[in-house]
């Protein structure tokens, strides 16, 4: 049996404990679930390790998270923590992305105060490749809240796709990048945005 670093073992124990408690969610009240989800979501974002993979790729557990989301659709804290948990489990640990998870993300992709958290993961889901208008979605990120999260993600997406921007969106994107340039408070940021604009033109 492979020796596991004691610090990693402590984190594994915490993940197991949280998952076991979340699995008993129907016995708990909304406040308890909110607290458990907040702590579990944090565990999906800690420094990655192969030792966590089996826990974060558990499809049965992912379905429990979706069931909780269906039960508490108006609890913003629970929904955001489930979005982040599933997003990290898919993008970092390669949890199988199901139609149900994609639909769940899609449902909240334009909801005020939540859509920005969806935008961190939604464009990187396999099924997003079949989204009828990817660039329309990207452009909608400019108005998502929390603004800082969504706009930082949009800058990253523009950088990754800088040579594939459809002509019809170039003007809007350059305008957005100019706004970011003007708001930047350091020379490095301003230079980066100017270079992006030159590449887009």
Where are these regions (language model features)?
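Amphipathic alpha-helical elements of HEAT/ARM-like alpha-solenoid repeat scaffolds that form extended
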Residues: 31-50, 77-90, 114-127, 150-164, ...
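Helix-loop junctions that connect tandem helical modules in alpha-solenoid scaffolds
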Residues: 15-31, 64-76, 105-119, 139-149, ...
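N-terminal alpha-helical scaffold/docking segments in eukaryotic complex subunits
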Residues: 1-54, 195
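Alpha-helical adaptor scaffolds
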Residues: 74, 82-83, 87-146
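Short amphipathic alpha-helix initiation/capping segments at coil-to-helix junctions
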Residues: 144-151, 166, 170
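Amphipathic alpha-helical scaffolding segments comprising HEAT/armadillo-like alpha-solenoid repeats
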Residues: 9-19, 49-68, 92-106, 130-140, ...
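Eukaryotic acidic, Ser/Thr-rich intrinsically disordered low-complexity regions
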Residues: 2-15, 19, 160, 166-201
């Amino acid at each position: 049996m492979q020796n596991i670093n004691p610090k990693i073992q402590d984190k594994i124990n915490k993940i197991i404990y949280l998952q076991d408690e979340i699995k008993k969610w129907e016995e708990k009240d909304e406040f308890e679930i909110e607290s458990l989800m907040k702590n579990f979501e944090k565990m999906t974002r800690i420094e990655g390790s192969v030792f966590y993979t089996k826990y974060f790729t558990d499809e049965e557990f992912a379905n429990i998270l979706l069931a909780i989301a269906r039960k508490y659709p108006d609890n913003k804290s629970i929904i955001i923590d489930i979005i982040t948990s599933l997003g990290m489990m898919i993008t970092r640990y390669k949890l199988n992305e199901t139609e149900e998870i994609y639909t769940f993300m899609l449902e909240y992709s334009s909801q005020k105060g939540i859509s920005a958290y969806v935008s961190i993961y939604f464009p990187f889901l396999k099924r997003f490749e079949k989204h009828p208008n990817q660039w329309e979605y990207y452009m909608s990120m400019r108005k998502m809240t929390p603004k800082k999260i969504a706009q930082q993600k949009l800058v990253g997406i523009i950088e990754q796709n800088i040579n594939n921007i459809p002509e019809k969106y170039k003007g809007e994107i350059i305008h957005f990048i100019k706004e970011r340039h003007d708001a930047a408070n350091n020379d490095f940021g301003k230079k980066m945005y100017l270079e992006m604009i030159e590449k887009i033109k």
